[in-house]
A protein has these predicted regions:
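Extracytoplasmic
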Residues: 31-33, 85
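Short, residue-level hotspots on alpha-helical faces of the histone-fold
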Residues: 63, 90-95
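Long, amphipathic alpha-helical surface segments
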Residues: 1-31, 40-47, 52-65, 69, ...
Length: 165
């Protein structure tokens, strides 16, 4: 294993933005959560203007990814390659730090079962729509992409060209 990975590469940022999109005004994310920018969930007390700039959306994304990064550094007990670190960042950005901390994905990862951990991504493809837990095609595509990034050969510099072609 090479140098210990402690930060995201552009692959994490690009894949997150690919699935979140950049919406420069508040909107409902499809499961009832008010969101703005590049998937930033508006928290109680946060106030935003009617419209934000792309640059501000990117700042929010970087702050949110910092939270995901901290969750990886706090919870993962095994060395990760860059693609694994990035894939977990995209995943945690979407599911949240608490869900990740209690996940079977993390348990398998920390047990050294990288293959088993990889197979857990797809189990997170559901959301509550009108109170009913339903498979969401967009989440399925996202989880497959996260899994592919997680499993990408560490020597591959630009795995996204094969993942989101």
């Amino acid at each position: 294993m090479g140098e210990l990975v402690k930060n995201f590469s552009d692959n994490c940022i690009k894949l997150t933005e690919h699935f979140e999109g950049a919406v420069l005004h508040k909107y409902d994310d499809g499961v009832g959560k008010i969101t703005i920018g590049i998937g930033h969930m508006v928290k109680p007390g946060e106030i935003f203007p009617e419209k934000i700039t792309y640059e501000f959306a990117k700042e929010l994304l970087m702050k949110d990814l910092q939270i995901a990064k901290n969750a990886i550094l706090k919870n993962v007990r095994v060395p990760l390659n860059q693609h694994q670190f990035d894939a977990l960042g995209v995943f945690i950005f979407n599911v949240g730090t608490n869900a990740f901390a209690g996940s079977t994905l993390l348990k398998k990862l920390n047990a050294g079962d990288f293959d088993g951990a990889s197979k857990e991504f797809i189990r997170w493809n559901k959301g509550r729509v009108k109170g009913v837990l339903s498979e969401m095609p967009g989440l399925t595509r996202r989880r497959v992409a996260e899994q592919k990034l997680f499993n990408s050969n560490p020597s591959l510099n630009n795995p996204l060209k094969f993942i989101i072609a």
